[in-house]
Amino acid sequence: MREKGWSPNPIDIICFTHFHADHISGLPGMLLTMGNAERTEPLLLIGPKGLTKVVASLRVIAPELPFEVKCIEITENAQTFSFEGFRLEAFRVNHNVLCYGYSMVIDRAGRFDKDRAMEQEIPMKFWSRLQKGETLEENGRVFTPDMVLGAERKGLKVTYSTDTRPTES
């Protein structure tokens, strides 16, 4: 990251697949780098059961940080976490230790239908907010996104899976 001139501070979530050293031993250095870059926002770590204990052990190297480190342990074979603007789907993979893969999914709303908005006499000042999913009210009349949006469009899904044997998905 440093070679590319990228700061780690925009990172809000780090997901761990499993606890082999080649997948987790870089965490103390990353935490210290974030602290040295004056990060103050909390950092969320997601991983298999035991994550809290593993992170506490690694924090011996990085005991004092100017930001909070939160841990979420995956408790099921498949688990979904919802965040603003996307969801994270964790799924169990076939490895010799408890191991997960992750899919980040960004859904997309339907296209804005200008003709439907005009037919229903929806004020133009509300169009962009309705398109963003807001429900609005004016003079006792309620305007909802489904009044002006078409069918949901295909979204974006990026999957990361490592250290796994072939398996049915």
Language model features with spans:
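Active-site metal-binding motif and surrounding structural segment of the metallo-beta-lactamase
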Residues: 1-46, 68-78
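Active-site metal-binding loops of divalent metal-dependent hydrolases
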Residues: 19, 49-50, 162-164
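Phosphate- and divalent-cation-binding pockets in alpha/beta enzyme and binding domains
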Residues: 23-26, 53-55, 169
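Non-catalytic surface loops within mature trypsin-like serine protease
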Residues: 49, 75-76, 106-108
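A gly/proline- and charged-residue-enriched helix-loop-helix capping module
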Residues: 52-59, 74-76
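Charged mid-protein connector segments
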Residues: 64-67, 71-97
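Active-site-proximal loop/helix segment associated with metal-binding centers of metalloenzymes
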Residues: 84-169
